């Protein structure tokens, strides 16, 4: 664990620019195995995203890399990634869904869904890795497509304005509901 060793001697800031490589392989029991406590998770998807801003603070580009086993239908996978990124952009930049005691206090038309004319250049990167036998080698590419988006955007704005934010939608951006 090279990262663990380096963290003993350096701060995170001191490790900026260094790269660390690793692999995670989940051991599971075969479907239908006669095991007392079977590990039944078939597969995990992994993802990372990058947000680049223009000088005025608008999003210039989103790059999204998703590891998904075998892309059975690559065009459909790209569409799923793009849709999830745009959904995540709405969460991060424009959508507000107030609740009061668990009950919605907004109507659909007032949520502030992200508008198509504001969508920046999107780069979908499909990372295929063989090895899983189930489902022709495919791993799910559903909700994971929207999960890294808001943190990537928040990180870009932190570099842009120095303001660390932990609530969505982010404040101090050029985007309005």
Residue ranges and their predicted role:
Residues 1-177:
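C-terminal catalytic domains of large/alpha subunits in multi-subunit enzymes
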């Amino acid at each position: 664990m090279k990262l663990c060793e380096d963290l003993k001697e350096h701060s995170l800031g001191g490790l900026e620019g260094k790269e660390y490589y690793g692999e995670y392989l989940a051991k599971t029991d075969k479907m239908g195995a006669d095991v007392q406590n079977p590990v039944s998770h078939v597969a995990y998807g992994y993802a990372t995203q990058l947000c680049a801003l223009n000088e005025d603070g608008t999003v210039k580009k989103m790059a999204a890399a998703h590891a998904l086993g075998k892309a059975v239908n690559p065009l459909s996978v790209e569409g799923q990634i793009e849709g999830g990124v745009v959904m995540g952009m709405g969460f991060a930049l424009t959508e507000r869904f107030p609740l009061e005691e668990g009950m919605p206090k907004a109507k659909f038309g007032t949520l502030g869904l992200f508008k198509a004319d504001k969508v920046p250049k999107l780069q979908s990167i499909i990372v295929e890795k063989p090895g899983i036998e189930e489902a022709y080698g495919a791993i799910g590419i559903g909700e994971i497509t929207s999960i890294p988006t808001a943190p990537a955007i928040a990180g870009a704005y932190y570099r842009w304005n120095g303001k660390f934010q932990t609530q969505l939608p982010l404040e101090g951006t050029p985007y309005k509901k």
